[in-house]
Every structure is written in C-alpha cells, then in structure tokens.
Amino acid sequence: MLSRVRVLAAWALVCVASWAVAERILLIPLDSRPAAGHFAQMIGRMASVEVTLPPIEHLGRFTDPGNPERIIEWLRDEDYSDVLAVIVSTDMVAFGGLIESRVDSVPYETAAYRMKRVGFIRQRHPQVPFYAFSAIMRIQPTATLANASWRMQLSKYVELQDRYRRTQRSEYAQSMRNLLARVPPVELNRYERTRARNHSLQLHLLQMVKDSLFDYVILGQDDAQPYGPHIPDQEALRRRIAQLGVASRVYICEGIDQHSNVLVSRALLRAHDWMPRVRVAFSDDAGRRKIASYESKNVELSLQDQLLASGARPVFRDGDHDYSLFLNVPDPRDPLFEGFLQVLIQDIEQGFPIAVADINLAKNGTGDPRLFQALWENHRMQRMLSYAGWNTAGNTMGTAIPAANVYLLARKIGVDPLQRELALREFILHRFVNDFAYHSFTRPKAYELIDSMSRASREETYGAEFERVNTLVQVDLAGYLDRYFREQFLGQKFFAGTEQYEITSLNDVRIELPWPRAYEVRLQFRIGTSSVSQLEPANRASGIPPSQSGRARYLPSP
C-alpha cells in the first residue's frame, strides 16, 4: 500500500518550467497499414514528437510492394538537425514490405545492398541513434486467392517437420507425406528459398549491430506457434547473437506489427534516460504460463519481452512502480476475472495510473466484452493511460505499453500539456473504436457483404465490389465512432497545465480500408476543445485543480 501512495505522491510533485522543443523520429514502417505507422505517430504526438514517415505512395499496398529505392533516398535526404532517432523496418528497406518479405522476388544480394546503403546513411549521422526491426518469417504464406488451395497444407507440413525433428514420431512422417502431395513442389521450393534468404539477411543485420550501424534491433516473430521452422531459425539467431556479443542490443520478441510503437517508446525513453517501472496485474495467474494464439512463448515471457524492448521494466510484486498494467489473459477463470475487474475499477476510480491490455482475444482478434463494458461505465475509458486489444497478444501488449510509457514520459519532460492530453484521449478513443467496435461489429458486416458477392473474397476484393465494402465500413464505423465519442468524451472536462478544457467536437474524420480486404481499417480524427477556466493562483504551483487541492491524484496535469 505504501508503494501505491508513493506513486500518487509522485504525480502531485510533477511540475515543469518550460515545454520541450519539438523533435522528430524518422520511421520507415513495415508497410502502409495504419498499425504499422499511424499508431506510432499517435503515440509520439503525446510527447510532442513528430513521427515522420516516407510518402505513402512509396509504401506499397498489400501484394504491390513498396519502393525501397525511393524510401532509402528519402531517408538520405531528410534534414537531421531535429531528428531524435531513426527506426527502420528492414523488411520494407530490403524487400518492399512485410508481404513482399514472404516471397522470393528480391534476391539476397539486392536486399543486402539496400541494407548497406542504410548503413552508409547512419555513418553520415553518427550522433543519431538508429533502431531496426525485422520479421522472423511466419509459418503460413500471406492469404491470397492464388494460394488458397495449398497454403494451409504447406503451413501444416512445415509445422510437422519441426515436430518430427524433435520427436522422431512415425505418425508425423506419414502425415507429412500426405500433406506434401497437396502442395505444389514449386511453391514449397519458393517458400524454403524465401526463409533461407530472410534468415541470411538477419544474420547480416546482426553483423551490422556488431559494427555499430544499428544501436538496437528487435527480431519480431511474425504469427507463430510452439512448433515450426521459425524455432530452429530462432535457435540459430540466438547462437549468432551470443557469438557476436550483441545480446544487450538485440531482442527477440513475439509479433511484428507493433514494433514501430515499441521502438518509438524505447527511443524516447533512452533519449531522456528514464526507465518506467511497471506493476503487472493478471486476470488469472494461471494465464501467465499459457501460450497465446499465434505465439511461441508463454504470456509472461512474451510480456517481459515487450516491456524490456519498449524501455520499461516489470515489477511483478507491489514494489515501487510508475504505473500498473492490467493484463486480461486468455480464458481467465470467472471468479478470478471478477476479482481482477473489481481491483481495476477501484484503481481507476481512485485515480491511479492504469494501462489495460486485453489479450483474452476471440478467434477474430476482438477483446473481452466484459472488460469493455466495465471500462465503458462511468466514463472510465478516458481515465486510463492506455488500452489495447487487437489481433494477437504481442500486438496488444506492444501497443498498450508504449503508449503508457510515452504519456508518462511526456509529463516528466515538459511538453505542450494540451497536445499531450488531447493525444492521450485521441489514442484511447481510437483504440476502443478501432480495436473493439471495428472487429466486433463492422468487420463481420463487411465479411457478410463480401460473402454475398460472387466476385469478392475475404482474402482480397477489388473494383466495384471493393467500393461497396469500403462504403459499408465508412458508414457503419462512423456510427460507432460518433456514439463512443458522444457517450464517453463529449462534454468531459480535463486539466492541461493550469488550464481546464472541455471536449467539444470531433473533427477531420477519415475512415477507409487501406488494403483490398476488410481485415483492418484506417481511422483518423482529431478531438476539439474549448478553454473552461484557469486554476486559482494558490494552486498553480502544483497543477492540482481546486477540487483536488491537498489530495495526490492522477487526474491533474502538470
């Protein structure tokens, strides 16, 4: 309990003399999906940092690759006078994006030369930290119409290869022969060549770390499971990391889509020499040892990876901490979940700094509706540091944690308090609409429409059929955005520095499908405010509103 009091007391003591000078982070994202770049931009905005991306036309779209040559030229020609860090997706630079990294269209020599050019740029700017992230190739090929007849058989075949490698059980050998008969030999050869090329490039990347061309690298395990060809790949990478002596600068984490967020957090925390301490509360302790869908490590190990890679560190008991992460694990037992929910609600109501990561995800990647309802009640949504619940456990934790880290950092370093508080609320609203409403309600409706059209498929849809789906998504999701905003945010008041503001409007709304499928959505907007009142002079030093004077609380804003 004493440690919790210290946490609250620390909030009351935060006071800034001036706002930080605006800085930039240059980010080469994984691809053009919002999760690859827009989420990181929203997080950076909390700290008044502009996360700058290459022109979107260079980033590709689904199976149309990005343009690495143009992107490298963009990176070369940027003005580095205000650049705090550079974050590079090696899959975009080397191959043209995540989807293109899963096929063998780019030779190793071309990919390695492109990485070498990035190394030359780093040498021209030795004062700027360079971070990189690279996908350890997932088991299954990208879902397209062209591979619909054999991709599942191929992924099951290579999974069984690893099971057989470890156990030598004869039944696996027979199943492998049956599956192999259903996979075109040319496609299996392409798949194996692609894996070998990607692995060779990652060995090259480790040497670049050894040569100080990158300060820190995340090797992100794309959608996986406990068995598969990625396991021996990881084992070989770990051996090479140890041989090169770069273990402190290379981290292997679950997931890939979230690592722009993770590295934005790490870059900012390292720039300001701060490591937040994160107390973790699980909805069911037994869930710590479960392996979440699409991951190869148990939840606790995956969580530690995301925390450490982001620049934070976990506190698993009630020691001193900067915020609490409430983690809803897969399939928690009902009595334990109810207790978890009660503590979460109490902490939010008391104003403690709270982040929520919901990894109790349904098969379609949607969060727990019971948790959503608890956060909906009593306007609890906008009283948190962050929330996420989308796609995979790694994606979720690697979104909620960086946002909480960066918001707290922004309070410490002295940035524009109104921008910080607005960016936080925009991020929270975005998460609930994007993560929960879209995948729970709008996306199923889009799939129903797709299934009703003979010239459309869930893998990819084009032309007039795509326009119909896109229009449905725009109209339907706009309704949820409007409702969530009106019922949770409109008219709510908050403090930014010594000024109180009221949320008045939702502006610049943009909703569209970024790729020719309904799997994800691009959602953009800005929240408008008006000034309500200033604090009384006696309370200006602490930044505590008159109603909270004498009480150390989370809600006041320095």
What is each model feature region?
Residues 1-9:
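Bacterial N-terminal signal peptides that target proteins for export
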Residues 15-17:
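N-terminal signal peptide c-region/cleavage motif recognized by signal peptidases
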Residues 23-558:
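An N-terminal assembly and electron-transfer interface module characteristic of large anaerobic redox
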